[in-house]
């Protein structure tokens, strides 16, 4: 075996020796004698086969004082009590030993220590960060191929197209242009992006003509061209082709109910024309910049709702199309929260349950101006301070080791909706494990990187959500068909149906998503909604903070209070909400209208307001004031 590995890896193959000599009574004392025996042969084989030795230490915790906490963690993971004589034991030597400790431990084999440093010098820098790894979408050959595009377009053509705006104006310096081409993967990748971008434009404009009719208005054409330009020059047309493909397959091939759209993707006219969403962003003043902003380079994120039963069918369709080795779910790591850490440690130490519950209940739900963890809770709660200094060693140790184990990974799960579709076998890019599919019982691939890390790797995440509401609607439509012989298309139901508004006005909304609470029903009866915009506004206002504006909103609708605009031109965007700024989109549109903010600047303003970034707002205030004054608006009103 040694010779085989040496032939395979050459000078990069080493023999590893370890020495874990237990020094405390309650530890694994069987390991070290076996290591002594094995190390003797390793040194012999090292000379015989001319393979270098390295010395290492198995590392499971940071330093020696964590050994006892690790011991309790092993009890938790194996389901054993601390005093169980048959439980798994480590040597308690498995900490990250210092150079001095390793030199002392392996003083008799200095060449092995030297070889360990040699091995360290061979380790190359590696980063998991990567540009987006876009799956390949099959474009019909009669539309065009990459090879045809390489013959048809020069690199100069591509450079001009990707460094100009949608109107053909040069918007990047030569240096910035070259950097952009490099970031997108170079000219080789650009041919693919252009092909996908052109095909996406064809599908989008075909959809626009079906929805808006011909000829398209200048407003629609300008919006479509702007969005398609951003999608293409950010390198994402393939993403939208893939999403529209599985959504249309769900609707037309699989008979699965698909939601009308949620989140910032509803601001895309291209998504609307492709059938990804069912909301017209132009009609409702929804903004594309909230979804994709060239000033904020990040992957698109479209959450797609399917009926509960159909979600699994869509995932199987995607897996069959792109290949089982290229589709994976995303792992989740469950960590030990404060109260759970106390209860877990108490259980393995056999602290009485009543005392365990008492200690856990002492932990507050939140601590003013501080993060909730056991360390801060002890400072905040005198009874926990007393427990930490208790004369009872079981109580004292419970607090001590719970504090050390809090935040450790307790178990793994599978992300409820996140799914990766990869260009290559997913194992080429990230480590994977397997998990059981709850629906089919079959094994499925799961990335070992969690969601917060996945985007850095460049892998493309799609969110497939199962929504019970869609299942209920689907079942209701089927029941109507069976009992009344009526074929109903939910998408064709008149949004201005008076009978429906009567139900809302009477507060009869039990079972209606986001409109069923008693408080919401009360306000609906007072509002007497008569337009879809009324319902949208009420939904947006019914949350902590904006709720204070609901009485004023209702009074303005019914004429009990005048509808006032600080600056007359603001009526353009505040008319539907009776002069009250309800939506973040209104903030963005008003900043452009009043102060000539760019699309990117208006989005930055939205984020700063949403996150209460005082410094950012103070920084943007002079620009807003200056822009408003240039447009002839009163400085005092602008203030």
Regions found by a protein language model. Give the residues of each.
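Alpha-helical scaffold/interaction cores of sigma-54-like transcription cofactors
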Residues: 1-639
């Amino acid at each position: 075996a040694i010779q085989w590995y040496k032939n395979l890896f050459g000078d990069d193959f080493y023999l590893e020796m370890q020495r874990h000599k237990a020094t405390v009574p309650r530890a694994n004392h069987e390991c070290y004698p076996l290591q002594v025996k094995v190390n003797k042969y390793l040194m012999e084989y090292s000379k015989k086969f001319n393979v270098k030795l390295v010395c290492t230490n198995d590392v499971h915790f940071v330093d020696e004082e964590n050994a006892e906490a690790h011991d309790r963690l092993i009890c938790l993971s194996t389901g054993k009590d601390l005093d169980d004589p048959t439980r798994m034991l480590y040597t308690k030597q498995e900490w990250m030993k210092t150079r001095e400790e390793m030199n002392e431990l392996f003083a008799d084999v200095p060449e092995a220590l030297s070889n360990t440093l040699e091995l360290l010098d061979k380790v190359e820098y590696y980063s998991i960060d990567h540009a987006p790894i876009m799956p390949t979408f099959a474009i019909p050959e009669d539309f065009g191929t990459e090879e045809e595009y390489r013959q048809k377009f020069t690199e100069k053509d591509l450079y001009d197209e990707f460094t100009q705006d949608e109107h053909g104006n040069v918007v990047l310096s030569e240096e910035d242009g070259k950097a952009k081409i490099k970031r997108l993967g170079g000219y080789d990748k650009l041919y693919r992006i252009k092909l996908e971008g052109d095909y996406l434009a064809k599908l989008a404009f075909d959809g626009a003509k079906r929805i808006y009719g011909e000829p398209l208005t200048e407003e629609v054409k300008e919006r479509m061209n702007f969005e398609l330009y951003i999608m293409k020059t950010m390198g994402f047309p393939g993403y939208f082709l893939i999403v529209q493909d599985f959504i249309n397959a769900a609707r037309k091939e699989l008979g699965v109910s698909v939601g009308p759209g949620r989140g910032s993707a509803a601001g895309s006219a291209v998504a609307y024309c492709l059938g990804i969403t069912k909301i017209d962003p132009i009609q409702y003043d929804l903004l594309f910049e909230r979804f994709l902003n060239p000033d904020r380079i990040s992957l698109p994120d479209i959450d797609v709702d399917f009926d509960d039963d159909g979600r699994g069918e869509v995932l199987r369709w995607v897996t069959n199309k792109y290949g089982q080795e290229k589709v994976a779910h995303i792992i989740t790591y469950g960590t030990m929260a404060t109260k759970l850490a106390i209860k877990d440690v108490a259980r393995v130490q056999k602290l009485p349950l009543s005392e365990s519950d008492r200690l856990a209940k002492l932990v507050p739900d939140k601590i003013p101006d501080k993060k909730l963890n056991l360390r801060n809770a002890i400072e905040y709660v005198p009874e926990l301070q007393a427990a930490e200094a208790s004369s009872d060693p079981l109580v004292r140790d419970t607090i001590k080791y719970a504090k050390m184990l809090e935040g450790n990974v307790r178990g793994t799960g599978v992300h409820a909706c996140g799914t990766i579709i990869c260009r290559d076998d997913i194992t080429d890019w990230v480590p994977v494990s397997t998990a059981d599919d709850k629906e089919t019982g079959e094994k499925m691939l799961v990335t070992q990187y969690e969601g917060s890390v996945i985007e850095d790797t460049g892998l493309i995440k799609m969110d497939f959500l199962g929504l019970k509401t869609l299942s209920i609607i689907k079942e209701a439509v089927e029941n109507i068909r069976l009992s009344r012989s009526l074929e109903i298309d939910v998408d064709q139901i008149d949004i201005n149906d008076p009978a429906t508004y009567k139900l809302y006005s009477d507060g009869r909304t039990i079972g209606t998503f986001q409109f069923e609470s008693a408080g919401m029903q009360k306000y609906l009866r007072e509002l007497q909604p008569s337009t879809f915009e009324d319902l949208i506004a009420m939904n947006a206002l019914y949350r902590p903070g904006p709720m204070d504006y609901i009485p004023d909103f209702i009074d303005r609708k019914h004429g009990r209070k005048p509808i006032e605009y600080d600056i007359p031109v603001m009526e353009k965007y505040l008319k539907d909400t009776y002069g009250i700024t309800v939506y973040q989109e209104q903030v963005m549109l008003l900043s452009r209208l009043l102060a000539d903010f760019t699309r990117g600047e208006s989005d930055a303003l939205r984020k700063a307001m949403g996150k209460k970034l005082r410094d950012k707002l103070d920084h943007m205030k002079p620009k807003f004031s200056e822009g408003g004054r240039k447009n002839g608006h009163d400085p005092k009103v602008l203030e």
